[in-house]
Swiss-Prot record:
Entry's family note: Belongs to the glycosyltransferase 29 family.
The protein's name in its UniProt record: Lactosylceramide alpha-2,3-sialyltransferase
The encoding gene: ST3GAL5
Enzyme class: transferase
Lumenal side: 27-362
Keywords: Disulfide bond, Glycoprotein, Glycosyltransferase, Golgi apparatus, Lipid metabolism, Membrane, Signal-anchor, Transferase, Transmembrane, Transmembrane helix
A Pfam short name: Glyco_transf_29
């Protein structure tokens, strides 16, 4: 039985947590992010559009180099990058394995039984056979950056073997610029598209699990069940009620990929127990997807990446009116470190930047 003093301490923590969440909610209601007028979006030079399209086509026309991405990452980061890392979870972790060392999203400590339950619902745990059969795969990771708008790269992006899209970034209405082919939609519950139109029957839905209720949500989506109301209370925004895909199209991202990205490659500090908030050590879904792509494909390209904070009035995304200045208010991610990482990959030739948001090569 717990001592009364410890019980009171736990009650106080819970009370303060609820109060803090309530305050943040009130602040959110009263805070309006500055909006950018998409109709007045900065002018896109037609010559630059042509150069971007030509460059992207040249990337595809060159002979694909087997294992190039993995080999390059291993040379660049040495022992900090594992060439043998599986991209998706295939079995529940044992206590002695790397997955059990950390809590989500860096591992599955104390969640082994939930992982096992999910895996039993998923008939497949790897890339589909038609993709595995390719001797050399080209990936493109499509970010949400406003820089994509106007480049008209859609047709070229559709020609990649594997097209990875992030969170709720839409295809409908933007296919001219971002294409309409999706191989992988990688996201967490709050980031999943709410519209059925953003899911195609052969997509892979790759779930990134951050917290306990994320497991409940994914189980409900796979089983096509309604998520209980009390579970919904633990999400910080509305989540999808249904994902119109068959169980064979769901995958669970290997959390060791997030751990490798955060602690080994970006060299963030490991998580520390804190009463409030969390360390700024969680990579963005975009950077995690780039590292995932190096494990999945032989060659990797990027499109729609890059934050130009010197242009605060330019659109942050290609699909909404949020300004670049909004990045100054986010506290979860270390944008500066991630930008340096992506720039290093582009400069060293590990990945190609098709839209020129990281380092223009055209």
């Amino acid at each position: 039985m717990r001592r009364p003093s410890l019980l009171l301490k736990d009650i106080l923590k819970c009370t303060l947590l609820v109060f803090g969440v309530w305050i943040l909610y009130i602040l959110k209601l009263n805070y309006t992010t500055e909006e950018c007028d998409m109709k007045k979006m900065h002018y896109v030079d037609p010559d630059r559009v042509k150069r971007a399209q030509t460059y992207a086509q040249q990337v595809l026309q060159k002979e694909c180099r087997p294992k190039f991405a993995k080999t390059s990452m291993a040379l660049l980061f040495e022992h900090r990058y594992s060439v043998d890392l599986l991209p998706f979870v295939q079995k529940a972790p044992k206590d002695s394995e790397a997955e059990s060392k950390y809590d989500p999203p860096f591992g599955f400590r104390k969640f082994s039984s939930k992982v096992q339950t999910l895996l039993e619902l998923l008939p497949e745990h790897d890339l589909p056979e038609h993709l595995k059969a390719k001797t050399c795969r080209r990936c493109v990771v499509i970010g949400s950056g406003g820089i994509l708008h106007g480049l008209e790269l859609g047709h070229t992006l559709n020609q990649f073997d594997v097209v990875i899209r992030l969170n709720s970034a839409p295809v409908e209405g933007y296919s001219e610029h971002v294409g309409n082919k999706t191989t992988i939609r990688m996201t967490y519950p709050e980031g999943a598209p709410l519209s059925d139109l953003e899911y195609y029957s052969n997509d892979l839905f790759v779930a990134v699990l951050f917290k306990s209720v994320d497991f409940n949500w994914l189980q409900a989506m796979v089983k096509n069940e309604t998520l209980p109301f009390w579970v919904r209370l633990f999400f910080w925004k509305q989540v999808a009620e249904k994902i119109p895909l068959q169980p064979k199209h769901f995958r669970i991202l290997n959390p060791v990929i997030i751990k490798e990205t955060a602690f080994d490659i970006l060299q963030y500090s490991e998580p520390q127990s804190r009463f409030w908030g969390r360390d700024k050590n969680v990579p963005t879904i975009g950077v995690i997807a780039v590292v995932l792509a190096t494990h999945l494909c032989d060659e990797v390209s990027l499109a729609g990446f890059g934050y130009d904070l010197s242009q605060p009035r330019t659109p942050l995304h290609y699909f909404d009116n949020q300004c670049m200045a909004a990045m100054n208010f986010q506290t979860m991610h270390n944008v500066t470190t991630e930008t340096k990482f992506l720039l290093k990959l582009v400069k060293e030739g590990v990945v190609k930047d098709l839209s020129g948001g990281i380092d223009r090569e055209f």
